[in-house]
Amino acid sequence: MAEYHIIMRISSLFALFLLFLQPALAEGLPELGDTAQLSLTPQAERRVGESIMRDIRLHDPDFADDPEVAEYLNAIGYRLVSNSQDARQDFEFFLVKDPTLNAFALPGGYIGVHTGLIITAQSESELAAVLAHEIAHVTQHHMARMVSKDGQLSTAVLAAMALAILARNSQLGSAAAAIGQASAITAQIGFTREFEREADRIGFLTLEKSGFDVRAMPAFFVRMQRAGRLYENNAPAYLRTHPVTTERIADAENRIQGVAYKQTPDSLDFQLVRAKLRADQGTARDALAQLEGDLREKKFSNETAARYGLAVALLRGKDPVRAEAELAPLLKTTDHPMFSGLLARIKQAKGDNKGAADTLRQALVRYPNNRSLNYAYIEALQQLGQNREAVSQLDQQIKNYPRDARLYALQAKGYASLGKRLLQHQAQAEVYVLQGSVSSAIEQLQLAQKSGDGDFYQLSSVDARLRDLKLQLAEETKQAKEKK
């Protein structure tokens, strides 16, 4: 019975991928079993990626909505992107709650990173090496080139892409044999060796230009190869989609020969993010015991990060008093936004919402552009009933990040508390737009029209947005009919 559910999951992912890919293609997809000419433009790749990401955010229980970790991943990611072959490409790096050691690239610049990769990375340069490799897959448009190889598109290739991108569970890979075209799918899973070599070469250059230790790349490959031999059929997930060959290791080792050694210490950001994720592993009791044991036995690379992780675990274990005591010495010696964020959460757990808001307000003076602190501050203001100030903060944040659904959701909540129904429905409409539900957004704008409040300019704004969305929905409906 379990195998049946696994197979159905694969089938649904494949169908989902076809559904997402279809609107983006200029010529449409072929019937199952046929082949056809295909051109997947960068714009189409982005639309495909956006569609898949919307589904991941809404329906994937493993999607980790952690602003602090996301902020770090995007900081290190864009440090690499700025030194890549296409710095103009938009990227978004996101976290996946999965203990396996893996990362993957979606079409259009979306790169998922498993918690297991961050936790087990032996250095920040090692994490950067994996990200640089995934960035190269995107900038070299390997997904589009895989689809259009030899000018042909086959159902097997599409199925393989769906599996490689979406089926992270090792059981899915083993159950793929139950699908009729198993041999063709197996042959296509993962990127081709040619693409892997190209991503290694370009990723290496990006890693070097970004100031990381390039020796981390072959070191990571060697570690993965050893893990593959040790675990055989239960090899790390990275090996199943990015096979590490002796040739790849040799190529990476040859590249570092001409590079002068440069000591590259890990950033405190990396150390803290890794400590936070370790504190979130397993049960609260097990995580706490592990972290206390590591500190007692001095099994850590950075004591500040280790004690921060312990404070996170203590708060998770509903002991805010001990958590604050553990954090207090760190606050005296080191200023970091993650410390301020944790202190605010500790104060909230102790029932001191005003103290939490004050902590966040003071931190934002030092870190005004920190998104996780801004989210937390707005939520703290709303908890205190200070909705006018919260809405004022949201207006500024939305100007900076106009495609952030979380901000619009908070804005809708704030306007609802203030009794501003038109603005509430208008904000909620933008949440639905960003989630890909245009019809739901239209319903919200129609409710805004009937709200009975709002001035002439606000009503005019609602009317204009409603017209635009109706045209968009009509065009999407037309395209869907043409594809049938």
How should these model regions be labeled?
Residues 2-104, 227-230, 289, 353, ...:
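Hydrophobic or amphipathic, alpha-helical segments that drive membrane association/targeting
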Residues 32-39, 50, 62, 71, ...:
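Extracytoplasmic and endomembrane cell-envelope/extracellular-matrix remodeling and assembly machinery
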Residues 111, 120, 138, 259, ...:
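TPR/TPR-like alpha-solenoid repeats
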Residues 112, 126-134, 138, 174, ...:
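Short alpha-helical catalytic segment bearing the HExxH-like zincin motif
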Residues 112-129, 189-194:
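Short pre-active-site segment immediately N-terminal to the catalytic Zn-binding motif
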Residues 125, 135-152:
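Catalytic Zn2+-binding segment of zinc metalloproteases
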Residues 154-169, 175-187:
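Membrane-active amphipathic alpha-helices enriched in small hydrophobic residues
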